[in-house]
UniProtKB/Swiss-Prot annotation:
The keyword Coiled coil applies. Residues 99-163, 253-280 form a coiled coil. It is found in: Cytoplasm, Cytoskeleton, Flagellum basal body; Cell projection, Cilium, Flagellum; Cytoplasm, Cytoskeleton, Flagellum axoneme. InterPro entries: DRC1/2_N (IPR039505), DRC1/DRC2 (IPR039750). Keywords: Cell projection, Cilium, Coiled coil, Cytoplasm, Cytoskeleton, Flagellum. Component of the nexin-dynein regulatory complex (N-DRC). Interacts with DRC1. The keyword Phosphoprotein does not apply. It comes from the Eukaryota. Pfam families: NYD-SP28. Belongs to the DRC2 family. One of its GO terms (cellular component) is motile cilium. This is Dynein regulatory complex subunit 2. Component of the nexin-dynein regulatory complex (N-DRC), a key regulator of ciliary/flagellar motility which maintains the alignment and integrity of the distal axoneme and regulates microtubule sliding in motile axonemes. Plays a critical role in the assembly of N-DRC and also stabilizes the assembly of multiple inner dynein arms and radial spokes. Coassembles with DRC1 to form a central scaffold needed for assembly of the N-DRC and its attachment to the outer doublet microtubules.
Length: 493
């Protein structure tokens, strides 16, 4: 009996192409969504794995650093133990050497103290003898000195009195000579003036008398001639011959009188010339006196000028001495400051030497100064090289600074050690940088981070691929097997 509730199955109607296409599209969308979901799951898985790797890399880095520090501590501890053993052995050896040196020095010191005490006693004895001898000698010398001083004092006083008396006599004599010369000059000048005045008056009176005499004589002659002329004129009428004779006679006489007048005129001219010469002499004497007075005034002016120059020189010398005193004071202050700086620098050097002595090695404490690296032949050649260039002053200066040779040895040694340590430091820094770079590369190879992924790393492989640049493909392209990540993810999940 068939059940009433069930309906018979109807055959499926065939789907159209549109329905098939729609179903295919839905299937494709479902496949795409499943693929996207798988891709999201794969991405999330990779991110989780990357975070886990970063966490593990950080833990591994801490473990490596811890183990590396432990290893370094152990190595450093072993090295320090070895250094301490070496230093302890060196210290014991140096202590033994120092003990032997101290014992020998103590023995030498006791011997030196005994020798010093013996030498001091002998020296004090000799000094006492020399002091007594010197006191006697000083007493004799003092007595001789006092005697010679008295003799020299007496001689000096007598000679001084003689010189003072002689000086006073010469001063009086010079004053008398000066007064006498001045009086003689005044007297001679007065006599010359009187003589000149008397000669002038005599010549003047004589000239006046001659003029008066000639005038009278000429007047008489003229009157006589006039009278004769009148007589001749009277007699002219009497006889012409007598008048001619009288005229000739008068003519001759007139010529004689004219000659006499001419001679008298020449005499007058000579007298005038003599008067002019005397006037010239008077003028010359007056000029000479004025010139002498001018010379005296010039000498006086020169003396005043020299006096002013001496005063100026004295002022300049006083100013120069004051400037020199100020300059000397400034230079002395500068010298004291420079010496103070030198002393401070020396104290600083000594303090630094005390501080540096703590860091000296045992070898430096035992042998602080290295020996010369030159052979004896090279040292002789260095001494004989250019001996003419070394003067006596330079040799003295070199001898004064010979004690600084050991200081410069230590200074140069420290300088060389500093340069060596600087060079070694640069080498160690280079090695450290290389080791750091290698360690960084190693840590970058075992860790994953954005910074690591942004750089080239041959150890980083994603999907069996490195981030290094690919080499150009060969001419024949090989065939690769392609495996989808979905299959890998399904196997991993």
């Amino acid at each position: 009996m068939s059940k009433k509730g069930k309906k018979p199955k109807l055959p499926k109607a065939p789907l159209s192409e549109e329905d098939q296409l729609l179903i295919f599209q839905q299937k494709m969308l479902a496949d795409e969504e499943a693929a996207k979901k798988k891709e999201r799951l794969l991405t999330q898985f990779l991110k989780d794995k990357l975070a886990k790797e970063e966490h593990n890399s950080a833990l591994n880095l801490n473990k490596i650093n811890t183990q590396w520090r432990t290893i370094l501590r152990e190595v450093k501890t072993r090295e320090l133990h070895q250094d301490i053993e070496i230093l302890s052995q060196t210290f014991e050896r140096v202590v033994d050497c120092k003990d032997s040196v101290i014992k020998s020095l103590a023995k030498d010191l006791t011997e030196a103290e005994e020798q010093y005490a013996h030498a001091l006693r002998s020296h004090l004895h000799n000094i006492d003898q020399l002091l007594t001898l010197q006191r006697r000698r000083l007493g004799l010398l003092e007595e001789n000195y006092n005697m010679e001083l008295e003799v020299l004092t007496k001689e000096f006083e007598t000679e001084r009195k003689l010189i003072i008396d002689h000086h006073e006599k010469e001063m009086h004599y010079l004053q008398d000579v000066f007064m006498a010369m001045e009086q003689n000059y005044i007297d001679s000048e007065y006599e010359s003036k009187l003589e000149f005045q008397s000669m002038w008056d005599d010549l003047k009176n004589k000239n006046l008398e001659e003029k008066h005499f000639l005038r009278l004589q000429l007047e008489n002659i003229v009157e006589d001639l006039w009278r004769r002329f009148q007589d001749a004129l009277k007699n002219y009428t009497d006889a012409t011959e007598d008048r001619k004779i009288a005229f000739e006679y008068l003519k001759v006489k007139d010529e004689k009188s004219s000659k006499e007048i001419e001679t008298q005129m020449k005499k007058i001219q000579k007298l005038q010339e003599t008067i002019g010469i005397l006037k010239g002499k008077i003028v010359a004497h007056s000029r000479e006196g004025e010139w002498q007075n001018q010379c005296i005034r010039n000498n006086k002016e020169l003396v005043h000028v020299q006096l002013r120059k001496l005063k100026v020189q004295r002022t300049q010398a006083r100013t120069l001495s004051q400037e020199n005193l100020v300059k000397l004071t400034l230079e002395s202050n500068a010298t004291l400051k420079a010496l103070k700086k030198v002393v401070e620098k020396g104290e600083k050097i000594l303090k630094l030497a005390e501080i540096c002595r703590k860091f000296e090695t045992e070898e430096e404490k035992v042998l602080p100064f290295y020996s010369s690296v030159l052979t004896p032949e090279e040292q002789e050649e260095a001494k004989l090289q250019n001996p003419e260039d070394i003067t006596e002053d330079l040799a003295k200066i070199m001898m004064d600074y010979a004690g600084m040779e050991n200081f410069w040895k230590r200074y140069n040694k420290v300088k060389l050690e500093v340069l060596s340590l600087q060079h070694r430091r640069l080498q160690l820094l280079d090695i450290s940088s290389k080791l750091r770079e290698m360690l960084k590369q190693y840590l970058d190879g075992i860790s994953v981070s954005d910074e690591v992924l942004s750089h080239l790393n041959p150890l980083f492989v994603v999907n069996h691929r490195s981030n290094l640049p690919q080499l150009p493909p060969p001419s024949a392209q090989p065939v690769y097997n392609v495996i989808e990540a979905a299959h890998i993810a399904s196997h991993i999940l």
